[in-house]
Amino acid sequence: MTTSFKFDSYEDFCKASVDEKNHYVYTRGSNPTTVKLENILAQLDHGEKCKVFASGMGAISATLFSLLKQGDHLLMINTIYGEAASFAQYLHNFGIESDRIDVANTDEIFQHVKENTKIIYFESPSSEKFEMLDLQKIANFAKKHNILTVIDATWASPLFTKPIDFGIDLVIHSLSKYVGGHSDVLGGSVVGSNKLVNQIFEYGHQFLDSTNSPFNSWLAIRGLRTLPLRMQHANQAIKVVLDALKDDDRIKRIYHPYCSENEQKELAQKYLKGYGSLFAFDLNTDDLEKVKIFINSLKTISIGVSWGGYESLALAVYKGNNLSALKKRKLEPTHIRIFVGLEDPNVILDDIKHALDTAFK
């Protein structure tokens, strides 16, 4: 842990100070512990280089800030992390256009591309509805039109998806989720080519100053040591829970690639090596009081934001005063998100069923 590095000579300092991304000068730019984390993540994501940030949102904002300029157009697909969508709106102040579109299949994306589109940004599976997109088809189209592709792949972790193998330019992860894995660290990463990541370092990282602390980098490295075991548990646990819930008539619809059909199932099989344990469902009711009763009846599952740590979490999208916003996002007000943590999945399943029994009695 240090903020500043010492040099043996004037010449050594001069050499390092003009190339801070490859030398240790000041921890705001680079640090040995953070570089170790970056090297591991680049290898896991099959990219040339990685830059780590203090949060996932730090990685997202630095990437968009670095690669877009006045007059450019940003195209965002389906439901994405809300703060990323808000940041895109903020970029309008700098003359950067953006649109967020909802599509049923990948081919619909391309009719929304403009002459000035510079980035196609998406999640796959998407936030909230967990829809899959055809990564290879998006990448092929984008390369023909000189458009960059950026995916937030946090849901599947670096172990269960490899977007760069299918031509995606940049992969973002929130390290606060599966990589950290213990609900005690914030962080974000972007992985891609040397050229693009160096550009993000020079502008987004250095100017926006979302620097990850060496200690947080160490915590993320600690998390990576158990990531394979935790993802194996996630893959097995989510199947236990979803197999038991899929025929429950109190649930209108389940959102998760494991429960998908037809083309969505084919895309999941092509692009996912396993399943993350974050899912959602709509309660089969118009009585919004049942949403509150369900959430308040959970005993093992905690109520809270974020996910990817050790504990199971639940979150309802309906907050009592946001029906118009949910309609705009095309979400049912009875939509509930659940993360299955490291507990015994049967314990989590019993908790969900108890809450359903209480809400629908």
Give names to the regions the model predicted.
Residues 49-250, 255, 266:
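Conserved PLP-enzyme active-site core in the AAT-like
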Residues 88-89, 98, 118, 285, ...:
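PLP-dependent enzyme catalytic core of the Aspartate aminotransferase-like
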Residues 239-299, 303-309, 322-327:
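Conserved small-domain helix->loop->beta segment predominantly found in fold-type I
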Residues 219-229, 277-285, 337-341:
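Short, well-ordered beta-strand elements within core beta-sheets of diverse protein domains
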Residues 7-58, 83-90:
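Conserved N-terminal alpha-helix of the aminotransferase class I/II PLP-enzyme fold
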Residues 3-8, 177, 258-262, 283-287, ...:
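Glycine-rich beta-alpha junction loops
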Residues 21, 185, 215, 274-278, ...:
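Short, solvent-exposed beta-strand edge segments and adjacent coil->beta transition regions
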Residues 6, 32, 253, 308-310, ...:
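Positively charged, small/polar-rich N-terminal and surface patches that mediate targeting and assembly
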